[in-house]
């Protein structure tokens, strides 16, 4: 009877591991997991377009981070705070959102194509790309000049 229970328990563990239930989400080395996604704070300043390109080249499905909830915003803020070195250029960090038309209206979707379900603007300006501001502990979104080099966070 005891051996039968051990075999049954072993099969249950294998089944749960294969189905992904109860297993940790597996991210590439150097990436952090949160809610079935992987994130990487990149401490190398780039323009918005170059940062987006860098993220797409890191992994299949990679893009600048899209923030869908306050919980995810808090996770990203902590990740950035812990992984971006303090310099004069750490006032802002790119996220995957920018204005797509001449009237400076923001796109209705993130750079990864997902819908905007959560917003946390600090102010509206005429610049086209969005980032997180250090002064708000990387929790508020601010409009920035797309060509300026800032650090950024990728998501897959």
Swiss-Prot record:
Tissue expr: Expressed by the venom gland.
Protein localization: Secreted
Domain C-type lectin span(s) in chain numbering: 34-155
Protein's UniProt keywords contain Signal: yes
Disulphide connectivity of cysteines: 27-38, 55-154, 129-146
Keyword field: Disulfide bond, Hemostasis impairing toxin, Secreted, Signal, Toxin
Signal peptide as annotated in the record: 1-23
GO terms of molecular function: toxin activity
GO cellular component: extracellular region
InterPro entries the record matches: C-type_lectin-like, C-type_lectin-like/link_sf, C-type_lectin/snaclec_domain, C-type_lectin_CS, CTDL_fold
Pfam families named in the record: Lectin_C
Other known facts: Shows greater sequence similarity to the alpha than beta subunits compared to other heterodimer snaclecs.
Job of this protein: Interferes with one step of hemostasis (modulation of platelet aggregation, or coagulation cascade, for example).
UniProt record similarity statement: Belongs to the snaclec family.
Subunit structure: Heterodimer; disulfide-linked.
Name of the molecule in the record: Snaclec A10
The organism of origin for this protein: Macrovipera lebetinus
